[in-house]
């Protein structure tokens, strides 16, 4: 949308400083990017081939994403039938739904026919992009896809954060961290379309928000293409994510709206974005399942009692991604410490921001929250199904991230929620500990099964990517190495965010201090915030001095 000026919203240019980046900022930015990729890399190795829900369908769809190719995806004898490596279809089912079974499955060279692949039910963009990594070496292909998705999303967040005005940089950063544990970290480095569906919609919201508000031309040239690319990623991965892009567009319009924005250029851009999202949404056969329920349905008659049951049980879908529901094929149960920390951090961020909402921000957040309620209820009610059937938490995790993104919006550096150093460090330590537990639990489920808790992941395992060296080498690509590396990398990532708190405008950054920001919209220290008491909380009026008589 064309840049606008508003008396209520004061965009800050993202390149006011001519000093450029300081060595400290470059160093910690590099550390944050590398540590984020290393964390996701550990999760990429933490589970075997086909470990996300419906991966038999998604893997075949990826291998056939470019149509028929000799030795990759061949034409079958029946309509919609394709012939692919049997391992793509059968490998997940040697351990799926049986948490006590390890992933000791054999890969075969044989090909077999199947009709379980994408025939237009889902958008084709995700499968087409991932299909470039498809080969006869299934292990190398799957790991390559997982790392590609990890690097793509991390660099996307880095680019958006760099281009945003400093007072908006907390929007993508805080929202990404808030939904990371554990589902976000598990699903992003995977072959599941939700790898894009969860985080790309948050990126789209953040990039579009910055594009509307920033006045800096260079930033707009970065944010505009990213907004377009992430719209294609979101809408091109899942039909429900296409619906969420429409919600994101509406939320951005509400939160930034002024009368000066009503111009032919802005209206054209908004209409074009809405049209693109709608094309992907209604161009997929599974859209009927997203809006009107699962094919085949469940209950023949859906009563008010079932609707009431869905309403009161709906929050389990919101908290499911924080560990209440299992990972993998929903069969890897997490320790309560994981979801208590994840959901607790999410709620603390949301509630700390509510008191700073203006009317527009409140309406924008309310729109996203309404989508969290009515989208799953509509799908379940139309299908005659109950909470726990058909709709999974990963379908809503992107909306939860967008909810935090909208809540973190602020109009300037002198607005929005703050947190003390103690609060931030408590959150940081809790996230690090919960992440250690989540990663180890996920690895242990496939190494030894959930019935056994190994004291040492390097011993007694039945599955791993490589065999244990017979010579007893001290350093090798072991499960413990992956677990420790991923745990340390996540802790380093959070520390790097703390070190960049001034540049990122994070809630833990105290605007009263004299810290300087060497990057972005404001290179000088922000002015001291006025400590005025809101009129609404004044209980008494200041007594006037009496006149002497």
Where are the model-predicted features located?
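Perimembrane helix-loop-helix junctions
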Residues: 210-215, 221, 244-274
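Interfacial juxtamembrane loops and adjacent helix segments
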Residues: 67-139
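Transmembrane-helix motifs of polytopic, lipid-linked glycan transferases
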Residues: 132, 144-168
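Start-transfer (signal-anchor) and selected internal transmembrane alpha helices
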Residues: 1-42, 265-273, 423-428, 488-533, ...
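Membrane-lumen/periplasm interface segments of multi-pass, membrane-embedded glycan/lipid transferases
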Residues: 129, 263-270, 278-356, 461-487, ...
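Short acidic/glycine- and proline-prone juxtamembrane loop motifs at membrane-interface regions
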Residues: 190-197
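Transmembrane helical bundles and short interhelical boundary loops of multi-pass, membrane-embedded
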Residues: 256, 277-278, 290-303, 421-521, ...
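Membrane-interface alpha helices of multi-pass inner-membrane proteins
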Residues: 186, 222-239, 244-250, 473
